[in-house]
């Protein structure tokens, strides 16, 4: 759309398998703008070039099954960029791409957001992507946001025990050979969440009060929102964490 665009993890949720790529891209453009077919085709060609698809003129004539999984994902990202939307929601869109193309697409998305003022919600498990891409980060556990703040504050000085464990489980070149932190237990079923805080059965900071659902609070001087009865102190934690930093 021209207001909100979605990039799915599986590109086949975006692409119609029986239509050529140019048909799908031109249709997406002309549904929102009064462009002739040649103008729309040129914009579609430029979008494919933006996401690193070689020979875009020829690839426009192809069908989705003629692309690899990574190439199909690039096409779906190009479709999302076509109409310069106000908001892009991206659900792990670079999972199937190699590191070089991933970096290129992240650069193009950043450039688009800076030039047009487009807001971006990037859903991912890759903290290195978040560190390099995001201004703010929301950490979710069992379907709820447990910590939210500026990306450098949260990744460098986590306060929620789950955030701390999540960052500690990422390999770091600064701690080569050292054992990774492990969060004990298993993620609970959303159909049978424990009473109170959903993380309390796995949490090293758990107290009796965690049996009641925590409210969102903003600890003084922390620069973030947190949903926790027993948060960790942010002071001095950076030396224990892997080398992930937004700075």
Residue ranges and their predicted role:
Residues 89-93, 97-178:
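P-loop NTP-binding/switch modules centered on Walker-like glycine-rich loops
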Residues 54-60, 148-247:
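Short catalytic/signature loops enriched in Gly
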Residues 39-51, 165-169:
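ABC nucleotide-binding domain "signature" region
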